[in-house]
From Swiss-Prot:
Organism, as annotated: Avian hepatitis E virus (isolate Chicken/California/Meng)
Region (Disordered): 22-54
Keyword check for Glycoprotein: yes
Intrachain disulfide bonds: none
This protein's record includes keyword Secreted: yes
Protein name as catalogued: Pro-secreted protein ORF2
Amino acid sequence: MSLCRLLLMLAMCCGVSRGSQTLPAGGRRGQRRRDNSAQWSTQQRPEGAVGPAPLTDVVTAAGTRTVPDVDQAGAVLVRQYNLVTSPLGLATLGSTNALLYAAPVSPLMPLQDGTTSNIMSTESSNYAQYRVQGLTVRWRPVVPNAVGGFSISMAYWPQTTSTPTSIDMNSITSTDVRVVLQPGSAGLLTIPHERLAYKNNGWRSVETVSVPQEDATSGMLMVCVHGTPWNSYTNSVYTGPLGMVDFAIKLQLRNLSPGNTNARVTRVKVTAPHTIKADPSGATITTAAAARFMADVRWGLGTAEDGEIGHGILGVLFNLADTVLGGLPSTLLRAASGQYMYGRPVGNANGEPEVKLYMSVEDAVNDKPIMVPHDIDLGTSTVTCQDYGNQHVDDRPSPAPAPKRALGTLRSGDVLRITGSMQYVTNAELLPQSVSQGYFGAGSTMMVHNLITGVRAPASSVDWTKATVDGVQVKTVDASSGSNRFAALPAFGKPAVWGPQGAGYFYQYNSTHQEWIYFLQNGSSVVWYAYTNMLGQKSDTSILFEVRPIQASDQPWFLAHHTGGDDCTTCLPLGLRTCCRQAPEDQSPETRRLLDRLSRTFPSPP
């Protein structure tokens, strides 16, 4: 090998080696690769050179992460709660198939047995929706080894909110989320995720007013005893506790819009000396926590109307010491151990904010307050008043209702009811064409009621010749004789007749055509066809019919008129010099191009 060739090969190798080690301009050494698998829950704004906005001075701190500027709408709070009950025993000794514990899975579950410091009384009250992401239930037995003759079952119903009427073993096995335990055996039941998220991906409403129960709870959990616990050592019925139920629940909480929280305005908490006063009209409590609700225009002192359940009703939450709970009357202890009640603001003689207490929402609606035998001094305690419905007029104004559709603006499917006194006539001047006899009613006494929109008015208040059905003007016909004109309103089939003596419809043999209801031009009369006076010469009658759409055969639709020459009034406005209805050899070039384009756009069916 010559020396020149050897030097050339060495130069090529060195060049390749240097090229592989040299980074191009703007190399990526030291830069982190972007993780394309990351799931972004919020959309972060792009960062500029000096900050999120121009001319923003940025001051950072070493070792401190800047809070990102993101939209918090829909941010999800994740919390885990571990709840445990007191030792559970049979309420009725010797009973079988008894219910030890039953509760809907929701934020209203108590944080500790014996109190109602529930999940809702914590930060979850600031959110609108919750979702049970995971739920594990554990049974911890406390029975001695000598006790037997029974079994424990834990069962979960994902789509129910009430306990079954029978809790025998057949009912327990009707759900596939269950476990049956022998005496003294500990158990663990993990609820499958698909059972917790069976609707709306598991999201449930934190609010309970005007919300179906299945939309405010994730399901029902039941712990039952089957058989009779028997103490073989004493040869008698076992009367002690059987065990405890331990919950491990993982919750997700979210709001549907920023600031949509109960704690914003509608939840007021006051710590002060409080006293529940006994009154012949019901127990009351004077608290500054209710001052905000006294001035609300929605919180009237009258009774709630139908459909207004939850409006005008407060949730009154007490945070009392356990020592005080021992002195509460049983009537208060039944209301969530005396810590959560409902109230309605009443105000006292001194103008102080006062709330009347109730056991439930239904009692508050029906004004059936709690009765206590004497005043109860709560000492310095915390009372929280929150809007049970979270529907203040001041806080969340309701949108104005949409205006009603006018009676003459009809849609197909509208149901009209025409009521009044009618007379059977055969006078041609009072009847439209093709109607030889029928019932005639004066428009001032005939009431027309659109049952779909709720609009009701006399027939004479509408110019029926200008009425429309789905935007199409109704057909008008002349009278059989004379100058009267009638507006013809199409109906599906035969109008139903409702009279004082009976109901039905007129049937004419071999007549299958659609019917019509006729209104005189000024609405002064209503006419409908009847081939006989079977209702009598005069009758107070109602007719009921459904409006059908106006068909092409009902309205005089005409095809466009073409002259076939250069003076076509249909084609000239379209920019064509000659009529398109000409022989192909006589058509202008732009007409042929237009027809060719139309044939490609709208091809003829095969």
